[in-house]
A protein has these predicted regions:
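Juxtamembrane regions of bacterial inner-membrane/periplasmic proteins
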Residues: 2-321
């Protein structure tokens, strides 16, 4: 009897071993098929991205610039027979396009160090940041300056995998057809900086009352921090919040060797004067209206501007029908 039981146990072990091998084989097959499928899909996606990147221009920056809503100016001669700006006319977007060579290098570097420190090295996509954002290892966003610019024309804010792939394709395509300087110029002229300002020129005028070319290092960093949260970091509404982030921006610039230690300390200690500050003095050619004459002057300007608009419309209709 004992011998029979041992023989029976041996027979039972064989089917169990066989079943285990079959299960292992099935698991291996599933893994291999999964890996092959992933490789095929990945290769297909990679091929399409590379083909799109090296294909025809997806976003023509010249057309993009021409299609942007831009501010118009109305000028008149004052009592000294000098031509002065009477009014600025704009729609929903207050934008004055400014060429890259008119922008201070400190302004460009402030945005780069804060938004995309490897901007000058990558080819449209910072894969380290993308991986970090996808895996949660990085606290910041994964989009580069080029990707942010590529996203603007579509105005697509929905966060989906498909949209992200399209954004990556457009960014790589942009870098194939345009220089870093051209991309940065377009970006700095289209991003929203609060108070209805689109681009650094109108933001500079709105917050500091000066041309963007006149901004110093401290002022450049002040503008750069607004884009993250235009209301929270609006220097007219929340100067304290703006100042904290401005100092962080200057710290990043110092770490990236975009500025020296002396420049950093000078900028951190610089007393900022905004257009709503008590010590603000308007630039030449513009007057600071007093309470008494403000309404009277505005009524005169409105009448003059309306007259100019009607005259221009009449002339255009006569010329073009």
């Amino acid at each position: 009897m004992g011998t029979a039981k041992k023989s029976s146990k041996k027979k039972n072990k064989k089917p169990n071993k066989k079943a285990g091998r079959i299960a292992l084989l099935v698991i291996l097959c599933v893994l291999v098929v999964g890996m092959l499928t992933t490789a095929i899909i990945g290769g297909y996606v990679f091929f399409n991205i590379v083909s799109f990147a090296h294909g025809e221009i997806a976003i023509n920056l010249d057309d993009y610039k021409a299609n942007q809503n831009q501010t118009s100016f109305v000028y008149a001669y004052d009592s000294n027979n000098e031509l002065v700006e009477m009014a600025q006319l704009h729609g929903e977007e207050n934008r004055i396009w400014v060429d890259s060579d008119k922008m201070p290098e400190n302004l460009k570097n402030a945005f780069i160090c804060l938004e995309d420190k490897r901007f000058k090295k990558h080819h449209g996509v910072d894969w380290l940041r993308t991986f970090g954002a996808a895996t949660g290892l990085s606290s910041g966003g994964g989009s580069t300056i080029t990707q942010q610019l590529a996203k603007n024309p579509t105005n697509d804010k929905e966060v989906t995998v498909v949209r992200k792939f399209k954004e990556i394709e457009r960014a790589l395509n942009l870098e194939q057809h345009y220089s870093k300087d051209a991309i940065l110029e377009a970006y700095l002229n289209t991003l929203y900086l609060g108070n209805g300002c689109y681009g650094v020129q109108t933001a500079s005028e709105t917050y500091f009352g000066k041309d963007v070319s006149e901004l110093n290092l401290a002022e450049c960093a002040t503008l750069a921090v607004i884009t993250k949260a235009p209301t929270t970091y609006n220097p007219l509404l929340n100067p304290e919040s703006n100042k904290k982030r401005q100092e962080l921006c200057l710290k990043y610039m110092l770490e990236e060797k975009a500025i020296s230690k002396e420049e950093y300390e000078e900028a951190v200690n610089y007393k900022l004067v905004f257009t709503n500050s008590e010590g603000y003095v308007p630039k030449p050619g513009k007057t600071k209206n007093t309470t008494e004459d403000k309404n009277t002057e505005k009524e005169y300007q409105d009448f003059y501007v309306d007259y100019v608009i009607k005259t221009v419309c009449k002339d255009l209709m006569s010329k073009y029908g």
